[in-house]
Amino acid sequence: MASRFRLPNGLTVVHEPNHTAPVVAFQLWVKVGSADEAPHEVGLAHLHEHMLFKGTARRGPGAIARSVEAHGGEINAWTSFDQTVYHVVMASRFAHEGLDVLADAVRNSAFDADELTREQEVVCEEIKRSLDMPSRRASKALFAGAYQQHPYGRPVIGFEADVRGHTREKVLSFYRTHYRPSNIVLSAVGDVTEVQVRGWAEALLGGDWGRPELPRHPRALEAPFASVRVALTVDEVKESWLHVAFQGPGVDHPDAPALDVLAMLVGQGDASRLSLEVKRKRALVKDVSAWSWTPKEPGLFAASLVVNQTSVEEAFEATLSVLATMTAAEVEPDELDTVKSLIESEAVYQRETVQGVARKLGSYESTMGGIEREAQYYEAIAQVTPARVREVAQRFITFDRAVVTGLLPAGSTFTEETARAVLKRVASARPAPLPARNVAPSKPIRMVGASGKAKEGLTVEKLPSGATLLVREERHVPLFAIRASVLGGLRAETPANNGVSLLLARTFTRGTAKHEPEQVSHLVDSLAGSLSALSGRGSMSLRAEFLSKHFERGFDLFAEVFNTPAFPEAEVRREQTQQLRELAARDDRPSLVAFELFAKTLFTQHPYRLSLSGEVASVEALTPEVLRAWHARLFDPSQLTLAVVGDVDTKAVLEAADRAFGTSRRKVEALHDVAPEPPITARREARRVLAKAQTHLVLGFPGGRFTDPWLRPLEVMTTLLSGQSGRLFMELRDKRSMAYSVSASSVEGVDPGFFAVTMATSPEKVPAALAGIREELQKLKDVPVPMDELVRAQRYLVGSQQIGLQRNGARAATMALDSLYGMGPERYRRYAEEIEAITPDDVQAVARRILDFDRETVVQVGP
């Protein structure tokens, strides 16, 4: 149960205990965002987010992140229009240290002038990075078009000229005005008591901060939309990104809950009206959604669509027509009940992680009027009726006062005149209601606890079919997760069928022998669950999560999809077309282009050289018959590893699994052997020219297998280089301001994978960036890592594992895949012991094994 108290200096603390896992989350919500900036302060709120981690009187540059990661934690921040949030999550035994670091950063930031100059350069690289992301550019255009007076119209990150022009005096003035106790909320959730939180908060955040109450810069008010606004930009992009928005209410408006219901009905999830009509039935868009954004002040109700290689006008009109139907007729009660249950279930799923609960409490307390508003919100959701949905649709979906913005490819025929004409046509038409949907009714979600005490340990069973079943009871939340994994994925593909695994994953849940595609989507929603398939380099999986009260129905639906997917012709052709369109639009994602070019250059024979998405010729050759054969080859129960984790009864799981997966369907054809990749004997380079703001770099080497004895030292080496206290981050970002992000990663597989460093930087910085990367890698080969740095990396890895395994789905995935790959389902429980046993000599040895510059592969993608 959440509680709240205030310190004498005005700082508010909200706390909720959760002793399920030894993890704690602290978040400091500062009630200032980019919308509070004066014109001469544009970009300062976001710049503060960067600067508060750059040192205090007690902790120099880099020490804040280093201290948190040394105690197994993660620290970061985000800035929005209305608030700036600093957050840490870590092992609860180090909870005091985590809050100490967070409080010191927010209360005592030094704002060193030299550090400010360096961080301004980093933010400018972040701005350039956003220029290479069509989704970011389209979003900025929407807010600029919708808010012509209000500061919501400015990007949170600011503009390069403004960021470079800020002085230390400006930064300090903004800090002293807004970073004061009465303007801050501490949200504390996890394995800590209220007594502990109260004592630490008073010691670390109490007392007089010496910052008097000062007037805030008033926000300009946005006038009501009086007419249609259209702003379209044509540029070198492959896809069309469109938004259509209507003026909406703020978070405290009584219509806000009903608009959330409307948004989910219209455009959230596979069973939403836009998805079914515009994406599935008519195949007009790559993606489409509707959303209600309710910030502190009037927000937006909007629909967003991404169109590739189809008529933008037709897709735009189809989207508007679906919106219009919501104003013309009331939604069916069963459909409404399902959506309301989905919204209510979000509160249950959020309880799986301490950081999720901390974010919810911080948001309610800082922005939404207090933590009590959560109960009021869900009460309002429960009271929404079909008539109420139609009422808010008629009030806010106003085609004569819409804002339309878009980012379009060169040669697009969609113009401002076209957009205005479509709006007029839809507004003047009398839309026919969409056909009634056959939706299974949902019962209201009751916010109850889990069903009882869990059994200790893991149950492992071999079913008669040969399937391996893993069951772990975890009763802290009334949810359960299922993960069914088989060997396959990219490693099983050839150039001729490259992309088959992804297409199978995209169509796996789109209908069964018993249920049509739309029926499967509705059934999942009626159970307030999720069901999806995914494909990786060495395996494929089907995964699901449901409320535990729906165990029998959820498990049966999961088994039905696994055993009898239909792969209908229409669904396969639709997803195949979409996959081909995405291949045609790859150049809009330069980081992906760089990584795929790296794989093709590093691997010359192994399937790892292939794209996870396939190539045009191979994807065009795929048919429903090919998918059915691929499914039959891989997804027989005899090949299956099935993990079930959560609020379940082991006996019931065993019985259900035996019914569903206890019999093998046929004699299974073995996967073909994969020839080993020939050794690399010389440096390899590749370059692709793209007209982008930054150059995307990948520098890498052959890597390891899942089962290699030096895998754990390789993880430690990767961590020493990555993270906010990692060597690459500290040297290339913090000291030299070469990039917004730089990271190292190790991708292992059934066969040897790769180790790589990735970075995006301005083209003129590329030679220095590559030299800097090699310099940091060489140090690991030449000098054993100091013991204190090694311990920090070890604690970070162990803490990150604890944080990452809070969700049932994460534990189910880890158990299933570790078992599938022959490492055992409880390998993750030995993780801390294995990591903590690593020595400096182990790290140096693996660095010398992997980091051979005579065999490096370097890829550049950019101007």
Describe these PLM feature segments.
Residues 14-16, 21-47, 61-105, 136-161, ...:
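M16 family metallopeptidases and their MPP-like homologs
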